[in-house]
Amino acid sequence: RIDEEHDLKERYGLKKVGGMREIWREKSALRRHRNQAMKLIGRVDSTEGHYSKEKEQLLNSLTKKGLLQSGADVGDVLEINVEHMLSRRLQSVVYYKGLAPSMRAARNLIVHGHICIGDQRMTVPGYHVLKEEEDSLRYSENSPFLDPEHPFRKELETLRYQEDEEEELEEDSSEKEES
């Protein structure tokens, strides 16, 4: 378990000291969602009344958070894991959208106020980004990184381009090995 948590801490760029607490927080939230889903699955009459409404609210909430696809069923809640939860954090979404070269750099950009959602400047790397907020994620208005000519942005584009080329080379070599 400890090795697994250290691996998650490295992969998602969590704090070096106290990063385990962030993982435990996500595991705790996941456990609450799963317990609620298991309670609803165990009910015989979950199709009408209060339980139907509770089930619908749970599914809508998790869909809005980006943890489930629309049209999912209560059983799908049990398939969510900690990595799904960690990948919905602001820090991870900033990295996946290409605004930072690494998870740690994404955390640094957020903490120093260079990232905003809409007009709201965000400084909490652990904030869970809703699906509808993903499109409005960008650099802050007062951030020097907003300028596409900034050396950081140029270096970021170069790094992304190199990663894409490396992936293409790996795909080509694996295709040749299969032939």
For each of these PLM feature ranges, what is it?
Residues 1-97, 116, 120-179:
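Ferredoxin-like alpha/beta domains used as RNA- or RNAP-binding modules
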Residues 100-104, 112:
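Beta-rich strand-turn-strand
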Residues 108:
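DNA-binding alpha-helical recognition surfaces that contact promoter or target DNA
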